[in-house]
């Protein structure tokens, strides 16, 4: 369920001779056509419940996202449906986007653009990333990719993850239980957690209060991991210096949302992964799994439905 090109659709269908591959723009548009479907691919934030109710034959669901939050319905949990995701596909594009946001903030690029539009020659004084401490909360493949790129700027990388392990691109690794102790050490806090029941509102008033007043908060993961009202409050009160955001609790962002007018917020409209390379990698993964599925072989990126990732 996505706008795939005719070329990509043909590639998928040709990979499994005798198969039928159809694409629809939305779950609502697809609903009348899924009764005989064996597999469905859609975004992890789309509502799958009506589709599964109308598709008794489905044995495999693939999330075009890393996240699968809205796919874990009662029927999904109860039926023997294999669930896979697009883990690893987004790493390069999302990590590059994160660095773009971070550098834009540090070098005050949005302010320079506003001055350009106003025809004003003002020279805002930016900062260097050199020597800064970056805390990455959620150190999966995207978190590691961000760390790898940030290390080029000679930064110190702190990682928070569920279980301790040695990490090539992290100077120190902490558990989630140690988050409150490590937050005050960071100049930049990057949220890279999956969306699960355990991570809902993971960043709230207490977490923002524990950060430096000069800290920058970046969320390129999922909106559900942040208490958005608490973030707005922290930004308005100056508890933190600013935020760079690619995900929001409601998308498109409502016209009256406070973020629109906040000069200490840089926003992008959920575009961190939207580059041509992403689509090529995504369809390659989908094609590999489609072939494996048709042969009864093990699928890549199978999700533990109980854990949610």
Where are these regions (language model features)?
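Phosphate-binding beta-alpha-beta segment of Rossmann-like dinucleotide-binding domains, i.e.
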Residues: 78-133, 148, 152
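Rossmann-like adenosine-cofactor binding region
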Residues: 164-258
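An N-terminal-biased, well-structured beta-alpha scaffold segment characteristic
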Residues: 1-82, 204
């Amino acid at each position: 369920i996505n706008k795939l090109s005719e070329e990509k659709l043909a590639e998928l269908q040709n990979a499994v001779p005798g198969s039928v591959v159809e694409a629809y723009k939305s779950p609502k548009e697809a609903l009348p056509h899924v009764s005989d479907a064996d597999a469905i691919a859609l975004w992890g934030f789309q509502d799958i419940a009506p589709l599964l109710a109308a598709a008794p034959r489905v044995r495999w669901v693939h999330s075009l996202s890393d996240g699968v939050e809205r796919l874990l319905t009662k029927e999904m949990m109860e039926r023997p449906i294999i669930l896979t995701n697009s883990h690893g596909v987004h790493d390069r594009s999302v990590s590059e986007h994160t660095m773009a946001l971070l550098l834009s903030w540090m070098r005050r690029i949005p302010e320079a653009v506003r001055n350009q539009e106003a025809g004003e020659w003002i020279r805002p004084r930016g900062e260097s990333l050199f020597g800064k401490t970056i805390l990455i909360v959620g150190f999966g493949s995207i978190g590691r990719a961000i760390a790898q790129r940030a290390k080029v700027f000679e930064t110190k990388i702190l990682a928070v993850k569920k279980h301790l392990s040695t990490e090539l691109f992290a100077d120190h690794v902490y558990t989630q239980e140690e988050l409150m102790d490590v937050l005050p050490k960071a100049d930049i806090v990057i949220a890279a957690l999956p969306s699960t029941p355990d991570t809902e509102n993971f960043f709230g008033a207490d977490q923002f209060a524990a950060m430096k007043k000069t800290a920058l908060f970046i969320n390129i993961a999922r909106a559900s991991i942040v208490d958005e009202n608490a973030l707005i409050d922290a930004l308005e009160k100056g508890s933190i210096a600013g935020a760079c955001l690619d995900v929001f609790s409601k998308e498109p962002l409502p016209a009256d949302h406070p973020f629109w007018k906040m000069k200490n917020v840089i926003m992008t409209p959920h575009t961190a992964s939207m580059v041509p390379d992403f689509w090529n990698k995504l369809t390659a993964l989908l094609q590999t799994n489609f072939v494996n599925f048709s042969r009864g072989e093990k699928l890549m990126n199978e999700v533990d439905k109980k854990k949610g990732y």
